[in-house]
Design a protein with these regions (language model features):
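Residue-level recognition of short, solvent-exposed, well-ordered loop/turn junctions
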Residues: 23, 79-80, 169, 260, ...
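Rossmann-fold dehydrogenase core element
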Residues: 263-264, 278-318
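Mid-domain Rossmann-like dinucleotide-binding core that forms the NAD(H)/NADP(H) cofactor-binding site
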Residues: 136, 142-224, 228
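Cysteine-cluster motifs in flexible loop/terminal segments that predominantly coordinate metals
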Residues: 37, 87-138
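C-terminal hydrophobic helical "lid"/dimerization subdomain
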Residues: 1-3, 253-257, 298-355
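Glycine-rich cofactor phosphate-binding loops and adjacent beta1-alpha1 units
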Residues: 166-168, 208-289, 353-355
Length: 355
């Protein structure tokens, strides 16, 4: 099979590699669509080498959808031909966090001998024609949800998990920092969950695109001071919830300052590993600002698929570009440099879905 392989940090190439064989409680899947995530360029560059990935050569990619080709031993609820969407995390299943449903925080992270998997980060990923997955990391998708839309389940789940952690005040005002794919979905779902107003903070074409997803007010960071503008839009009070979806320097501090007294801040964006910021501790304490770190998307894939199938979340609005695996270099360049209004850029390792 063909796969995108990282032979060493900073390099990638399309290679012929052996098709993997599913083990117990695993399925072999044909990858029909895989989306480029913001973490992928960093993994490819090698900025996290030694952790993501732990060694080379390595196949990245974790936001995918496809179909089951072969079921391993002990699999009875999936069969060849089933359409599925994947998520990156699969916990060991027996540590305290896994037993409480927080498998995204598995105590045995990075130890495959315990059963832990983090596909596309630590375990082989989806930039390939086929890959093997635990049945605990896949969710069925109905015929009404395309493979391309199914490849959005993982990233949309990140937004939903962050929203569920902090909650959304019915009739309240929300600020979202960062109009990338996760931020845009956060806008849409915040309105779905009852927010009366959503303020999007960002820049460029993606900021303008957030109107399509339900943003009521836009704050352009290239033209105005974000905290002052959000405060002005809320009569000086601040927002009920602020969602940081960019991971950029300075935005955590901004999110805290945007929150009203008793407000909540949810951190969805993944900052660079070296990023350190001074925090307004006195402000946080005196105003009882609740802060939530939000990692990945545990236990929400089924909900996201229902949102897609019902039309409440329109995946097609996020997908701007689609490339074959052989044009990954062009796809990556389009994504990283936001060319031609790029939002979500997809790869189809096995060609386009039949209409």
């Amino acid at each position: 099979m063909k796969a995108l392989v990282l032979p060493e940090p900073g390099k990638f190439e399309i290679r012929e590699v052996p098709t993997p064989v599913p083990g117990p409680q695993e399925v072999l899947c044909r990858i029909r669509a895989v989306a480029i995530c913001g973490s992928d360029p960093e993994i490819i560059r090698g900025g996290l080498a030694g952790t993501w990935p732990p060694s080379y050569p390595f196949i990245p990619g974790h936001e995918w959808a496809g179909e089951v080709v072969e079921a391993g031993e002990g699999v009875w609820d999936f069969k060849a031909g089933d359409r599925v969407a994947g998520q990156a995390h699969k916990g060991c299943g027996y540590c305290r966090n896994c037993l409480s449903g927080r498998y995204n925080l598995c105590e045995n992270y990075g130890r495959p001998e315990t059963g832990h998997r983090h596909y596309g980060f630590v375990s082989p990923g989806a930039y390939a024609q086929y890959n093997v997955y635990s049945i605990k990391s896949i969710t069925p998708i109905p015929a009404g949800v395309s493979f391309r839309e199914g490849a959005l389940v993982d990233s949309a789940g990140v937004a939903l998990h962050g929203l569920e952690l902090s909650g959304v005040t019915t009739g309240g005002t929300v600020a979202v920092i960062g109009p990338g794919p996760i931020g845009l979905v956060t806008v849409k779902l915040a309105k779905t969950m009852g927010a009366a107003r959503v303020i999007m903070v960002g820049r460029g074409a993606r900021l303008k695109a957030s109107k399509k997803f339900g943003a009521d007010l836009l704050v352009d960071i290239e033209k105005e001071e974000p905290v002052e503008s959000v405060r002005r839009y809320t009569d000086g009070l601040g927002v009920d919830e602020a969602f940081e979806c960019s991971g950029a320097a300075g935005t955590f501090h901004q999110a805290v300052r945007m929150a009203r007294k008793g407000g909540r801040v949810s951190l969805l964006g993944v900052p660079p590993g070296s990023l350190m910021e001074p925090l307004p501790f006195k402000y946080i304490v005196h105003n009882e600002i609740a802060i939530f770190g939000s990692r990945a998307n545990p236990n929400v894939s089924g909900k996201v698929i229902h949102l897609l199938s019902s039309g409440q979340l329109k995946g097609k609005d996020l997908i701007t570009h689609v490339f074959p695996l052989t044009e990954f270099d062009q796809a990556l360049d389009t994504f990283v440099n936001r060319k031609d209004g790029a939002i979500k850029v997809l790869i189809e390792p096995n060609g386009p879905e039949e209409s």
